[in-house]
């Protein structure tokens, strides 16, 4: 379950292509329509499905890099033996990120902002497209309570998408008219909202979803929280459909102040 992309390919272009193969991307929250997929994974933008993020470098797999000297270098499984096309002929998929040797050379490239070399293509791991998705939200005035629940959800691997937004960001994402919609939405929301999705796949999807929902209900009750199908006027289904695509224009992070600066605590 891997795809290979060149710089400049956007999430809007790649999402339907992998969907045709029954796959999906582990993508960041509402990237810009013009955002390069390769640029996103090289910058280590936080993804929405921590269940599948085994390492800080995920979902990046392999890369082809040209250094300032003009030397070509391939990281991970793509390093060889043979060219990439020769690897394809024998079933090589450029999925493992480590190597060549025992070193993790891809870590030199990620976060370097082009100072170490120019990436000409990258492969990234994809996930299976679920057959059933049941989204939920949990609102709270306490971030600590939601963090406790999130920790258990991820630890027990029961959810796919899983993230927390404050009222300002959630309102900014769904406000259609500024500033009227933004103020109205923000006032109707709790200070913090946890969103998560329970998914079922090929084998016994309904039973899987029902079982996870029951277990999560036990968790929320133990923590004094309650899962719901909507946060204020925003339904969980609407959130799910929105976050599985790139941001509409104008870019949601620019709506409030006209500019933004992302700071990732990795």
Predicted regions and their residues:
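FAD-binding subdomain of flavoenzyme oxidoreductases
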Residues: 7, 11-153
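C-terminal substrate-recognition/cap domain of FAD-linked oxidoreductases
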Residues: 137-266
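Glycine-rich N-terminal segment of FAD-binding domains in flavoprotein oxidoreductases
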Residues: 1, 5
């Amino acid at each position: 379950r891997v795809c290979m992309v060149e710089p400049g390919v956007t999430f809007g272009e790649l999402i339907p292509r992998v969907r045709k193969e029954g796959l999906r991307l582990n993508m960041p929250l509402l990237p810009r329509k013009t955002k390069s997929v390769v640029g996103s994974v090289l910058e280590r933008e936080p993804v929405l499905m921590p269940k599948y993020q085994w390492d800080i470098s995920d979902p990046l797999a392999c890369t082809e890099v040209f250094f300032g000297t003009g030397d070509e270098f391939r990281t991970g499984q793509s390093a060889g033996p043979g060219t990439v096309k020769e690897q394809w002929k024998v079933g090589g998929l450029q999925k493992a990120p480590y190597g060549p040797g025992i070193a993790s050379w891809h870590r030199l490239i990620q976060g370097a902002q082009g100072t170490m070399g120019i990436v000409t293509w990258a492969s990234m791991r994809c996930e299976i497209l679920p057959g059933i998705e049941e989204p939920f939200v949990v609102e709270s005035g306490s971030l600590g309570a939601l963090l406790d629940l999130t920790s258990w959800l991820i630890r027990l691997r029961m959810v796919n998408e899983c993230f927390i937004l404050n009222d300002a960001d959630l309102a900014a994402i769904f406000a259609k008219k500024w500033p009227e919609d933004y103020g109205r939405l923000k006032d109707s929301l709790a200070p913090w909202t946890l969103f998560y999705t329970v998914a079922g796949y090929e084998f016994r999807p309904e039973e899987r979803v029902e079982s996870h929902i029951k277990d999560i209900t036990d968790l929320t009750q133990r923590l004094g929280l309650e899962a719901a199908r909507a946060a204020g006027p925003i339904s969980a289904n609407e959130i799910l459909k929105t976050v599985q695509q790139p941001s509409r224009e104008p870019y949601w992070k620019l709506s409030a102040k006209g500019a933004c600066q992302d700071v990732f605590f990795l």
